[in-house]
């Protein structure tokens, strides 16, 4: 049996530096670059930097960029190496923060928001493939949870760091985010491990992926569609839909951020102890119920509890899906290929869902509950795909 340096056990003290670098990358590229934009939207409009329509358009630029980055990540790493590509993408995100401090034009902003999204997609494809080969097999789930904890920290930070920065003005806010991104880029710079030499003789290059992998692609796509409404409309639902006001909406968003911090590590822990497939089934069932209850809940305690549960899902499902890829595809090189395709599937449905839910929200006269029920249906469909009759359907959806 051929062996690879990717399978060698690293000393415990050396494991945490790459994991920390991965956490910094997910925090900068997704946690801050995407989620810190949400609380900036009202300020961008009130300061007359851009119109309301332009602000939504600029937000979509990041999602489109994420899809492009997911497609370009592996070719970029092939030319630059994983480590250099990750470093470059973190520099790009940092530059985007600084550039957004200057409202030159809508085109200027769109270009930088697009670039930050491209960097986020590329990092999401490459970060686990760079770090996890240096982690013992029994701890890969927990390690991937720690890496993607950065997304949760960014969601939480969007509700705690941005408001104080906004008191200094929009330019200072963007510059502050850029300074934080620059610091995290510097701290992670020497934490990235050297690329491992992959030996792929254990699997033929043209060997087809197992059918269960395409099933996972379909599941991951519908998970993406299911997480969008709460991620985008939760605060508006509480503040305007329920008439509770912006303050209560902000408090519920903080609880969502708390869930986002808890999610990655706890879901990774589940993957290590229950296996990825059972964990995905459990998580999807809980999420479908929580989203259904969100559509009919009105008390603060219920909303806060549901926000924690639902908030754990966007960053938490990443290590679970990655663990499932590792269960289904033993060869390290093919794991990278499968994860890249899964990320593209996720990014595509997330972008499409974002536009579709926005259109439906406008067409329904701002009916938040309808969006949450549809998202619960998407999560339930993802769960159904994991059963025999669903597996046949999923292979028809995404198999080339």
Protein language model annotation of sequence segments:
Residues 49, 81, 102-108, 243, ...:
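Helix-breaking motifs and short loop linkers at transmembrane-helix boundaries and internal kinks
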Residues 107-116, 301-309:
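Paired small-residue
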Residues 112-150:
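Cytoplasmic helix-loop-helix junction between adjacent transmembrane helices
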Residues 122-135, 316-330:
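Intracellular juxtamembrane helix-capping segments at the cytosolic ends
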């Amino acid at each position: 049996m051929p062996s690879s340096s990717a399978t060698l056990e690293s000393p415990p003290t050396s494991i945490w530096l790459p994991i920390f670098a991965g956490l910094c990358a997910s925090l900068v590229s997704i946690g801050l670059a995407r989620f810190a934009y949400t609380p900036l939207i009202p300020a961008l409009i009130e300061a007359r930097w851009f119109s309301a329509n332009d602000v939504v358009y600029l937000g979509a630029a990041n999602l489109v960029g994420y899809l492009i980055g997911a497609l370009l990540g592996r070719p970029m790493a092939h030319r630059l190496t994983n480590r250099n590509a990750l470093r470059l993408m973190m520099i790009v995100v940092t530059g985007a923060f600084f550039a957004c401090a200057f409202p030159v034009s809508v085109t200027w902003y769109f270009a930088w928001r697009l670039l930050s999204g491209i960097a986020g997609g590329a990092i999401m494809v490459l970060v686990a493939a760079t770090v996890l080969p240096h982690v013992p097999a029994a701890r890969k789930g927990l390690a991937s949870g720690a890496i993607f904890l950065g997304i949760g920290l960014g969601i939480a930070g969007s509700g705690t760091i941005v408001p104080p920065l906004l008191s200094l003005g929009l330019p200072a806010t963007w510059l502050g985010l850029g300074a934080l991104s620059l610091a995290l880029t510097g701290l992670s710079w020497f934490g990235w491990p050297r690329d491992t030499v992959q030996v792929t003789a254990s699997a033929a290059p043209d060997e087809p992926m197992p059918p269960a992998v395409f099933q996972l692609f379909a599941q991951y796509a519908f998970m993406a569609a299911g997480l969008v409404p709460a991620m985008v409309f939760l605060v508006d639902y509480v503040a305007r839909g329920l008439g509770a006001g912006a303050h209560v909406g902000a408090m519920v968003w903080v609880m969502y951020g708390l869930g986002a911090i808890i999610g990655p590590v706890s879901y990774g822990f589940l993957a290590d102890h229950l296996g990825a497939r059972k964990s995905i089934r459990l998580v999807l069932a809980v999420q479908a119920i929580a989203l259904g209850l969100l559509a009919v809940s009105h008390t603060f305690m219920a909303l806060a509890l549901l926000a924690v549960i639902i908030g754990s899902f966007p960053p938490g499902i990443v290590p679970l899906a990655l663990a499932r890829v590792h269960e289904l595809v033993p060869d390290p090189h093919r794991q990278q290929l499968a994860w890249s395709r899964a990320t593209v599937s996720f990014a595509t449905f997330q972008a499409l869902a974002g536009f579709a839910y926005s259109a439906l929200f406008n067409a329904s006269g701002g009916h938040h509950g309808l969006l949450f029920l549809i998202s619960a249906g998407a999560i339930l469909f993802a769960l159904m795909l994991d059963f025999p009759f669903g597996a046949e359907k999923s292979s028809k959806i995404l198999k080339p």
